[in-house]
């Protein structure tokens, strides 16, 4: 008799946890949009130092990068010229 009560309690607890998971899971699904920035800091000359800003937008050239040594405002320049083409 005690084992039957224990099994019933375990089943009821698992139903409660499944219900809670379903409620939490629906809110997580809506907020899981990943933001990918247009420009990223990359290493162009020195392998261990990020020294340029490169464009990651769709439809652009692969080598569209600005060296910080040549362009002091490389980040701003990348953000202005690099646009998403959807």
UniProtKB/Swiss-Prot annotation:
Signal peptide segment: 1-21
Keywords: Disulfide bond, Signal
Record-level GO BP terms: suspensor development
UniProt family annotation: Belongs to the MEG family.
Entry annotated with the keyword Nucleus: no
The protein's name: EMBRYO SURROUNDING FACTOR 1-like protein 2
Domain of life: Eukaryota
Organism: Arabidopsis thaliana
Coiled-coil blocks: none
Disulfide bonds: 39-54, 44-82, 52-78, 55-65
Keyword Signal on entry: yes
């Amino acid at each position: 008799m005690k084992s039957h009560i224990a099994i019933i309690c375990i089943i009821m607890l698992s139903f409660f946890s499944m219900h809670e998971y379903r409620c939490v899971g629906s809110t997580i699904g809506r907020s899981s949009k990943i933001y990918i920035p247009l420009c990223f800091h990359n290493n162009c000359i020195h392998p261990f130092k990020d020294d340029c800003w490169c464009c990651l937008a769709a439809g652009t050239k692969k080598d569209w990068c600005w060296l910080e040594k040549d362009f002091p405002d490389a980040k701003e320049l990348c953000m202005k010229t690099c646009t998403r083409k959807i």
